[in-house]
Amino acid sequence: MNDKNEESIDFGYQKVARNQKKNLVADVFQSVAAKYDVMNDLMSFGIHRLWKRYTIDCSGVRRGMKVLDIAGGTGDLTAQFSRRVGAEGEVVLADINDAMLKVGRDKLRDRGIIGNVRYVQADAEELPFDDNTFDVITIAFGLRNVTDKDKALRSMLRVLKPGGRVLILEFSKPVSATLNQVYDFYSFNILPKMGQVVANDSDSYQYLAESIRMHPDQETLKSMMEAAGYEKVDYQNMTGGVVALHRGYKF
Ligand SMILES: C[S@@+](CC[C@H](N)C(=O)[O-])C[C@H]1O[C@@H](n2cnc3c(N)ncnc32)[C@H](O)[C@@H]1O
């Protein structure tokens, strides 16, 4: 019998049993949650804010809409969606990790973002929502960490309303060889040291660099989305392909 859980799967460059990956990923985000935002700003020189703003601009979000920000973590996208959907709309910030959710919830409440945001602990692979619930779904820097990405893509499509769109913001493959070299040097020599100094945790940032290299490239992810049933799938590279924004629709 072919038991899926006995197959091995990548956790960064390591091969681990399929049913171990969730716990290992949980350990990473449990460990980095408190320093997650400050590390994001440092590591990306603040550029992650532009990637996220562009994602919102491409989402087509309007007042009154219902949005799911899955793997939403500390809530950067949720905060912007909350303003755009207004009091008649709703944003669900969902994440598998309670520590990340707590940091997100505290941050948004401190900023006065309340009333139209709901917090749900959920796994992207098995979303606990009815079919055809959301107008817009985002997953930013989250899909890379999911064990069964195809299952997560199908789960997101199921809860998306007809006419709605899913946006996947994720690290991808730089388009130029030179940029790739610089990026590799930065990721493997500088990032883990930064993680050690700021978050007292170099392993999690080593995992970050490795998991990015193991993630499907632009065209592969596009094919995976099409295979899952998304229509009119496209993507746009940002920062030379360091990051890509994939978009797919349900009609
Ligand atoms: C790198 S953070 C991204 C947070 C936020 N979206 C952002 O862009 O700043 C990745 C998040 O994915 C969450 N995550 C990992 N696996 C998940 C899964 N299977 N389902 C839902 N969330 C998951 C982690 O807990 C973490 O909060």
From Swiss-Prot:
<keyword id="KW-0831">Ubiquinone biosynthesis</keyword>
<protein>
    <recommendedName>
        <fullName>Ubiquinone/menaquinone biosynthesis C-methyltransferase UbiE</fullName>
        <ecNumber>2.1.1.163</ecNumber>
        <ecNumber>2.1.1.201</ecNumber>
    </recommendedName>
</protein>
<dbReference type="GO" id="GO:0032259">
    <property type="term" value="P:methylation"/>
</dbReference>
<comment type="function">
    <text>Methyltransferase required for the conversion of demethylmenaquinol (DMKH2) to menaquinol (MKH2) and the conversion of 2-polyprenyl-6-methoxy-1,4-benzoquinol (DDMQH2) to 2-polyprenyl-3-methyl-6-methoxy-1,4-benzoquinol (DMQH2).</text>
</comment>
<dbReference type="GO" id="GO:0043770">
    <property type="term" value="F:demethylmenaquinone methyltransferase activity"/>
</dbReference>
<keyword id="KW-0808">Transferase</keyword>
<feature type="binding site">
    <location>
        <begin position="123"/>
        <end position="124"/>
    </location>
    <ligand>
        <name>S-adenosyl-L-methionine</name>
    </ligand>
</feature>
<dbReference type="InterPro" id="IPR023576">
    <property type="entry name" value="UbiE/COQ5_MeTrFase_CS"/>
</dbReference>
<keyword id="KW-0474">Menaquinone biosynthesis</keyword>
<keyword id="KW-0949">S-adenosyl-L-methionine</keyword>
<dbReference type="Pfam" id="PF01209">
    <property type="entry name" value="Ubie_methyltran"/>
</dbReference>
<dbReference type="InterPro" id="IPR004033">
    <property type="entry name" value="UbiE/COQ5_MeTrFase"/>
</dbReference>
<comment type="similarity">
    <text>Belongs to the class I-like SAM-binding methyltransferase superfamily. MenG/UbiE family.</text>
</comment>
<dbReference type="GO" id="GO:0008425">
    <property type="term" value="F:2-methoxy-6-polyprenyl-1,4-benzoquinol methyltransferase activity"/>
</dbReference>
<dbReference type="InterPro" id="IPR029063">
    <property type="entry name" value="SAM-dependent_MTases_sf"/>
</dbReference>
<keyword id="KW-0489">Methyltransferase</keyword>
<feature type="binding site">
    <location>
        <position position="95"/>
    </location>
    <ligand>
        <name>S-adenosyl-L-methionine</name>
    </ligand>
</feature>
<dbReference type="GO" id="GO:0009060">
    <property type="term" value="P:aerobic respiration"/>
</dbReference>
<dbReference type="GO" id="GO:0009234">
    <property type="term" value="P:menaquinone biosynthetic process"/>
</dbReference>
<feature type="binding site">
    <location>
        <position position="74"/>
    </location>
    <ligand>
        <name>S-adenosyl-L-methionine</name>
    </ligand>
</feature>
<comment type="pathway">
    <text>Cofactor biosynthesis; ubiquinone biosynthesis.</text>
</comment>
<comment type="pathway">
    <text>Quinol/quinone metabolism; menaquinone biosynthesis; menaquinol from 1,4-dihydroxy-2-naphthoate: step 2/2.</text>
</comment>
